[in-house]
UniProtKB/Swiss-Prot annotation:
Organism: Arabidopsis thaliana (Mouse-ear cress)
Gene Ontology biological process terms from the UniProt entry: multidimensional cell growth; organ growth; positive regulation of organ growth; response to brassinosteroid
Family annotation (InterPro entries): ARGOS/ARL/OSR1
Gene ablation phenotype (knockout): Smaller lateral organs including cotyledons and leaves.
The protein's name in its UniProt record: ARGOS-like protein
Region (Organ Size Related (OSR) domain): 71-122
Gene name, Swiss-Prot/TrEMBL: ARL
Membrane topology term: Multi-pass membrane protein
Length: 135
């Protein structure tokens, strides 16, 4: 058991060193990777066995709050109800006649408007910074 903790501790320290080196390289903007060594950074603080166990047990905790999950309970009820109604209503309702042609143009017009707005340049060009480039 002690050997497992020491091996795990070494792995965690190696990951921390790798992460800190990657962050330092990103901040500096240094793209010369020839001189990079994973042991060259400042040593990570060594954690005790109890501290290591606490961090591991808190990460793999099986107890999770409903509010911390991706969907809340209320949204799950709404999604299940909407799904059930979309599956059941077409079986119950009689076939409906198609809507008038002008009514079909409304969603097409909304889509065209959204595409025009999406490709329109921003009117506030003073606040555009050069750090917002993604490439």
């Amino acid at each position: 058991m002690i050997r497992e903790f020491s091996s795990l501790q070494n792995d965690i320290i190696n990951i921390q060193e790798h992460y800190s080196l990657n962050n330092n390289m990103d901040v500096r903007g240094d793209h010369n990777r020839k001189n990079t060594s994973f042991r060259g950074s400042a040593p990570a603080p060594i954690m005790g066995k109890q501290e290591l166990f606490r961090t591991l047990s808190s990460q793999n905790s099986p107890r999770r709050l409903i509010s911390a999950s991706y969907f809340s309970l209320e949204s799950m009820v709404v999604l299940v109800g909407l799904t059930a109604s979309l599956l059941i209503l077409p079986l119950i309702l009689p076939p409906l006649p198609p809507p008038p042609f002008m009514l079909l143009l409304i969603p097409i017009g909304i889509m065209v408007l959204l595409m025009v707005l999406a490709f329109m340049p921003s009117s506030n060009s003073k606040h555009v910074s050069s750090s917002s480039t993604f490439m």
